[in-house]
Amino acid sequence: MYCQYYGLKERPFNVTSDPAFFFSSKKHQEAISHLLYGVSQRKGIIVLTGEIGTGKTTICRFFLNQVSKNVKTAFILNPAFSEIQLLESIVRDFGITSKNKTKLGMVWDLNSFLLRESVAGNNLVLIIDEAQNLKPGLLEQVRLLSNLETEKDKLLQVILVGQPELNNRLNLYDLRQLRQRIMVRYHIGPLENEEIKLYINHRLEIARAEKNLENNIKFSDEAIDMIARFSAGTPRLINMICDRALLAGFVSETNHLDFGIIKRCIEELDSYSVGQNA
């Protein structure tokens, strides 16, 4: 609605996990470095955690664009499965043609595939997002898959991505064998206050239709400060506020987004949140 008014080719503050908008904050870059290290060194199991809206899925999608050509991946987004369904999803996402419908048969087909890919010099990575939703039995299944190996290397690298509750799940006594196999961990924190203005301007720059024209959208310093306080540095909340602010600016026919506009947008978001929870 407001894109043409502001000279934008797309909405800069969508809450979807678009890697084109990846912002290299200190913590996000550290997260990418941990993932690249864990995969390249074939560490086996890697755990990436962060609160809701901190950019975990965006980091994973950006990571997929950074890995070398010999890295092949399967990306499971919502693992609310049974053990059989999880295996079916992994086999399907790796592009494996399997006529087996039993758990043992699919593991056999997966192992054969991993061995062939290893001989070809490829590194296979399984990413499971929202892994805090995995029941203990499924996490044990993941551990067993991570056991697939040659004399020298792990055949499958596993990245578990989830909210902090994932750590609580992994600390269960029955999952102690899995916990001992986690070789790389990283927790994504919020953006620093000084990064928030850079983050906003970065997304506006990516979305700008004419790169040779100066960005005509201006958030005042007071507006940025209020966004920082309300969002506590959480990218998703920053996006929600800024998207509403651009709409409010469009309705008011202004490119200058000040404290008053941001205050109204935050009040609307708070009101909506209260209504949702009523």
Locate the predicted segments by residue.
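A short, basic N-terminal segment
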Residues: 1-42, 275-278
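Conserved NTP-binding/hydrolysis module of P-loop NTPases
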Residues: 11-13, 70-72, 81-100
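Walker A/P-loop nucleotide-binding motif
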Residues: 41-63, 79
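Sensor-1/coupling segment of RecA-like P-loop NTPase cores
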Residues: 47-52, 58, 105-109, 133-138, ...
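Short regulatory helix/loop adjacent to the ATP-binding pocket of P-loop NTPases
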Residues: 62-66, 166-181, 190
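Conserved AAA+ ATPase "SRH/arginine-finger" region at the nucleotide-binding site
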Residues: 76-80, 169-170, 183-196
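Mid-core helix/loop region of P-loop NTP-binding domains shared across ATPases and GTPases
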Residues: 82-85, 97-141, 150-154, 191-196, ...
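C-terminal alpha-helical "lid" subdomain
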Residues: 177, 205-278
